[in-house]
Each structure stands twice: as C-alpha cells, then as structure tokens.
Regions:
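Phosphate-end processing signature that detects enzymes handling 5′-triphosphorylated RNA
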Residues: 2, 12-15, 22-207
Length: 207
C-alpha cells in the first residue's frame, strides 16, 4: 500500500515480493494510459507498507465507505507496466539500496495495450519528498527508447526531454528491468491524500 501527499495536480526495485517472469523488452509495449498531459510535475510524500491480500481487501472495504475510488479502477483496479532504465553499473539501484538522500529513477510507463503513447518519467528523491516529472511520448518514440536509442527525445520542445536525453545518453543508461502490477486507488474528498494498493506484482530480473 502506498499513501501519498501531493502538493500539485510511484515500482523500480521495490520488488521483494515480486514473482520473476520472462517479459521481454519488445513485449513491454503490448500494454492503458490514463488521461495524459504532455508534461506534469508533482511534489509529494510517500509512505509504503507491506500487507497480506486479506488485509488489503479488508482495508479496501473500509476505504470504500470514506474515500472516492479512482475513476480508472474498474472492478479489480488497473494495470501498470513500467520499464526502468539505469546506468551500466546500476548507479540508481545502488543509490536506493544505500539509502542515499538524493537519488532518481527513470522509467517508461504504459497502462494499456492499445495506447498510442507512453509516459517517460523521472522520480527524484529529495529528503522526505519526491519530485516526479512526466513527459508524454509517442508509441514510436517509446519503442526507440526501449532499444536504448534516445535521439527521439530531441524532437520534444520541453527542457525535460533534453534533460533526459543528456542524462541517458551521456551516462549510458540502458533498459534494465520491467515491473508490472495491478493498482487500486482511492482519493480523499477533503484533501489530496491518495491511497493505492499494488498487488499481483511481477518483474523481470534483467532485460
């Protein structure tokens, strides 16, 4: 379960309970994109907890009475599939394992097999807060990114695209792992607190 506190309008290697599968990089784009914007920036705090499936269902039933369900939930939540990038020596992974105060994750995220675009995202840990920036890219450009070809980012006018290109190109980022799971989300009516349940987690050990 993840509880987040957003200041404006989430997993990489957090997969201790993940079941390893054989999803290949090309299969990554057999993926639902929520209503997307071209660039979105969010500052928030996150608190994460492990729980059993029984506990999840019990708490979910309680939240049904006091919070709003995400419009995309459906009967069993919605699917999320993310391809994570890292340097050759897995610097971002090691920074997380070492618990560094300043660290980042770069990922390509898609929610729907029929989607014609994906979200390129960078999450940066800054003390107790996280900053997440997202850029909408076309399906064709997303495929190029899965092949380690980043020049397609140069066609986007936003400085975030240029930042990602420079970082991923100069520091030799490569596709590293795919994480897929189902998410059920709740939103508080009174404020911007969001509670999500992630389950049925699967991941590749390496791309």
């Amino acid at each position: 379960m993840t509880q987040s506190y957003e200041s404006t309008a989430e997993s990489c290697y957090d997969c201790q309970a993940a079941k390893m599968t054989g999803i290949s990089v090309p299969d990554f784009l057999q993926l639902f994109v929520l209503e997307g914007c071209y660039l979105n920036e969010v500052y928030r705090q996150e608190k994460k907890y492990f729980m059993t499936l029984f506990e999840m269902k019990k708490l979910s039933g309680q939240l049904d009475r006091v919070m709003l369900q995400d419009a995309h939930n459906g009967a069993n939540g919605y699917n999320i599939r993310s391809l994570y990038f890292d340097t050759i020596n897995e610097r971002d992974y090691e920074a997380k394992i070492d618990g560094l105060e300043l660290r980042r994750k770069i990922r390509l995220r898609i929610y729907d097999p029929a989607a014609d675009f994906a979200m390129l995202e960078m999450k940066q840990k800054e003390g107790s807060y996280q900053k997440k920036r997202s850029l909408r890219v076309s399906r064709e450009d997303a495929i190029e990114l899965t092949k380690g070809r980043y020049h397609s980012l140069l066609k986007y006018a936003d400085p975030f695209a240029a930042e990602c290109y420079g970082l991923m190109h100069m520091e030799c980022y490569r596709p590293k792992t795919i994480v897929e799971y189902k998410r059920k989300a709740y939103i508080a009516k009174e404020n911007k607190i969001r509670i999500t349940f992630d389950h049925q987690i699967q991941a590749t050990e390496s791309c």
